[in-house]
Structure formats: structure tokens, C-alpha cells
From Swiss-Prot:
Entries under CDD domains matching the protein: NUDIX_Ap4A_hydrolase_plant_like
UniProt cross-references to Pfam families, sorted A to Z: NUDIX
Keyword entries, A-Z: Hydrolase
Positions of the Nudix hydrolase domain: 8-160
NCBIfam families given in the database record: PRK00714.1-5
Name by which UniProt lists this protein: RNA pyrophosphohydrolase
Length: 168
């Protein structure tokens, strides 16, 4: 049996999407084995990097697949890859037990469109499965309080790295 610490991390992207007021997009997860309770079901968009795909290309694809958003400009990115481990009980269920957690390349983007562009219930015109049941704009510093606890350290680092975009 493979030990959890011997498994690789799943390569992913994370996105801090800022509106003009400097708040970030948070989506409330529909479901998943990682849920603890409703107060920790909010997160920023994220997703896997396909084989041969560049991280920024994956970021734009994932953003569209989860929110229908295309109207963005890049503000910056975290230089390092940020990783988190899944709790043991979740690691066996998520991704068929192939990964110990995720390693993420984080990007900051400014949303330049109209909120009517955002569609989390039928993202991509219904071409993609909904991952969120609700969304809102909130303060970047609050995101770590609202995310599932095992992702909190990553969100705190993202907040430090991208704080300058929250007050433009």
C-alpha cells in the first residue's frame, strides 16, 4: 500500500479575481469529499493543469469553466508553487487516491466585464459542470477564514502576495 506522503501533488492553478473595488471572487462549492461545513465551503476558482498546458493557459480555461468569465487582465502571479496536503480521510476519495494534495500556481486577475458575464450555474453556456452554487465579492483577507481549513495556509500566503491588488 502506498503511503500518503509518497504520493505526488496534483499540478493546479488558483485564481484571485479582483473586481474594480478590490474585492475577490469567492464561489461556494456545491459538494465534495473535502467539505467540513457550510461556513468553510467558499473558495477562489482553481483547477488542474492538463498535460502539455501552460499554467496561465490553464488558469484562463479553469476560470471560464467554473464562472464563464473571460473579461480579465493579468495583474500578477505568485512566484512559488503553493502546496497543501489533503487530510488522510479525503485523500483516498479525491482523484481516486492518486495524489496527496495539490501544488498550485496562483494568478491575480482583474475582472473587467459586467457581472452579467458571470454564470456559475451553467458555466460556459452549459458546456461545463457547475462547481459553485453561489458566489460573491469579498475582502481578500476574509478568504482564508471561509475556505476549508487545510487550504488556509495557502490562502494566507495568496493574501500576502496579492494584497497590493486589493486596494487599487
Amino acid at each position: 500500500m502506498t503511503r500518503l506522503e509518497d504520493l505526488p501533488y496534483r499540478p493546479c492553478v488558483g485564481l484571485a479575481i479582483f473586481n474594480r473595488a478590490g474585492q475577490v471572487f469567492l464561489g461556494q462549492r456545491l459538494s465534495g469529499p473535502e467539505h467540513v461545513d457550510a461556513t468553510h465551503s467558499w473558495q477562489m476558482p482553481q483547477g488542474g493543469i492538463d498535460k502539455g498546458e501552460e499554467p496561465y493557459e490553464a488558469a484562463l480555461r479553469e476560470l471560464y469553466e467554473e464562472t464563464s468569465i473571460r473579461s480579465v487582465v493579468k495583474l500578477g502571479e505568485v512566484e512559488d508553487w503553493l502546496s497543501y496536503d489533503l487530510p488522510g480521510r479525503v485523500a483516498g476519495e479525491a482523484w481516486k487516491g492518486k495524489y496527496r494534495g495539490q501544488t498550485q500556481k496562483w494568478f491575480a486577475l482583474r475582472f473587467t466585464g459586467d457581472e452579467g458575464e458571470i454564470d456559475i450555474l451553467k458555466p460556459g453556456g452549459g458546456a461545463h459542470k457547475a462547481e459553485f452554487c453561489n458566489w460573491r465579492w469579498d475582502a481578500l483577507d476574509r478568504a482564508a477564514e471561509l475556505v476549508i481549513p487545510f487550504k488556509r495556509q495557502v490562502y494566507e500566503r495568496v493574501a500576502r502576495e496579492f494584497r497590493r491588488f486589493a486596494h487599487d
